[in-house]
């Protein structure tokens, strides 16, 4: 399939031939949901820890005798009913990782990119270079595309673009090798350079 390529310097629009497997696949909602959930789950620390009544500090003696005090009966000061007592169903450290193999991950990424193209939320540009890390220069370039909140995907690490976009609200920059499904799904619009498209195609093939 062919994608239209926009240019900031010249008016003539060109096209870029890409693989259907990477940018023209059908949208698999169930797979995308599974991969996104697995990615988010993998980011959880899983370090939450609470103490049970067995682990919390305190005496094991009965606080007062069973009958005759007028108070409610109590067998331990470490009861979950008591202040500073243990937790009834205490949370323990756990691993939230969900298994997703490479084939599933690549298929989900291709599915998301293809759907973004169909919705016209993905714009390909020939290049995006800044002579200096100036926010104004980047803002003027993006203004020509008439986009709101945008995720910029570039090939490699461009210091000028990273610095220029740092204080722009609604603009984020990501390398094509490290872009993830959550960033793609959350993005309102996406601007991708030609080099980044080729890198994504290699990554998903």
Curated annotation (Swiss-Prot):
Start and end residues of each stretch annotated as Disordered: 44-79
Molecular functions (GO terms): rRNA binding; structural constituent of ribosome
Residues in coiled coil: none
Keywords of the record: Ribonucleoprotein, Ribosomal protein, RNA-binding, rRNA-binding
Protein name: Large ribosomal subunit protein uL4
Organism from which the protein derives: Coxiella burnetii (strain Dugway 5J108-111)
Assembly description: Part of the 50S ribosomal subunit.
Taxonomic placement: Bacteria, Pseudomonadati, Pseudomonadota, Gammaproteobacteria, Legionellales
InterPro entries linked to this entry: Ribosomal_uL4, Ribosomal_uL4-like, Ribosomal_uL4_dom_sf
Entry's Gene Ontology cellular component terms: ribonucleoprotein complex; ribosome
């Amino acid at each position: 399939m062919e994608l239209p390529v926009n240019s900031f310097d010249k008016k003539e629009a060109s096209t870029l031939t890409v693989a259907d497997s990477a940018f023209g696949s059908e949208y698999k909602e169930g797979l995308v949901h599974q991969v996104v959930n697995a990615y988010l789950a993998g980011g959880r620390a899983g370090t939450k820890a609470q103490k049970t009544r067995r682990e919390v500090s305190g005496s094991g003696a009965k606080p007062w005798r069973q009958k005759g005090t007028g108070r409610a009966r109590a067998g331990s000061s470490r009861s979950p009913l008591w202040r500073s007592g243990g937790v009834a169903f205490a949370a323990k450290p756990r691993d939230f990782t969900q298994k997703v193999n490479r084939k599933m991950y690549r298929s989900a990424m291709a599915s998301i990119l293809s759907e973004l193209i169909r919705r016209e939320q993905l714009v390909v540009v020939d290049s995006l270079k800044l002579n200096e890390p100036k926010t104004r220069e980047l803002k003027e370039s993006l203004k020509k595309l008439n986009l709101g909140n945008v995720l910029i995907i570039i090939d490699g690490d461009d210091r000028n673009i990273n610095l220029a976009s740092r204080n722009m609200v609604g603009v984020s920059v990501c390398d094509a090798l490290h872009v993830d499904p959550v960033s793609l799904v959350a993005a309102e619009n996406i601007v991708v350079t030609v080099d980044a498209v080729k890198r994504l195609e290699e990554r998903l093939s």
